[in-house]
Design a protein with these regions (language model features):
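Short alpha-helix capping/helix-loop boundary micro-motifs
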Residues: 22-27
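Structural beta-strand/beta-sheet cores of well-ordered domains, especially the beta-sheet scaffolds
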Residues: 15-17, 36, 93
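Short, basic/aromatic beta-hairpin or loop at an interaction surface
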Residues: 6-19
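Preference for bulky hydrophobic residues occupying beta-strand positions
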Residues: 19-21, 97
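Acidic, aromatic-enriched beta-alpha/helix-loop junctions
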Residues: 36-76
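Short, compact, well-ordered microdomains
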Residues: 72-121
Length: 122
């Protein structure tokens, strides 16, 4: 009997990220300072103890983070570009997204859809 199931593993890699305030060239009304940062590990954000982070700066980085967690084609802009800015034009805050480590994850640990169910349909 032939097995038509593809030989696929349920494991995948994501980069852990550190998002760092690289520069502030204007007036930051949220009192951010160069070096302020947060981490993204798997699907969880973490902030250093007692450190605040501007909501508006955070929201400008968030759409980029899932793509930066994944290895893309070397020519893809997400592989070469690592900066984003706060949307407040008076602030002129620039953040840098650094890949700091790779994390191994399993599909069933991060999804309510069973890998076995998905893999049977392929």
């Amino acid at each position: 009997m032939m097995n038509n199931k593809p030989d696929q593993t349920d494991e995948f890699e994501l980069y852990d990220l550190k998002v760092v305030v690289e520069s502030i060239e204007g007036n930051c009304t949220c009192n951010m300072t160069e070096g302020d940062h947060f981490f993204l590990k798997g699907g969880k954000l973490s902030f250093p103890c007692e450190q605040d982070f501007c909501l508006y700066a955070l929201q400008s980085a968030i759409p980029l983070l899932p793509a930066k967690q994944r290895q893309c084609h070397p020519a893809d802009w997400i592989e070469t570009d690592s900066r984003c800015v706060c949307p407040d034009p008076a602030c002129r805050l620039t953040m840098r997204i650094d890949r700091i480590a790779k994390r191994q994850l399993k599909h069933d640990d991060v999804s309510p859809v069973s890998w076995d169910d998905v893999n049977c349909k392929v």
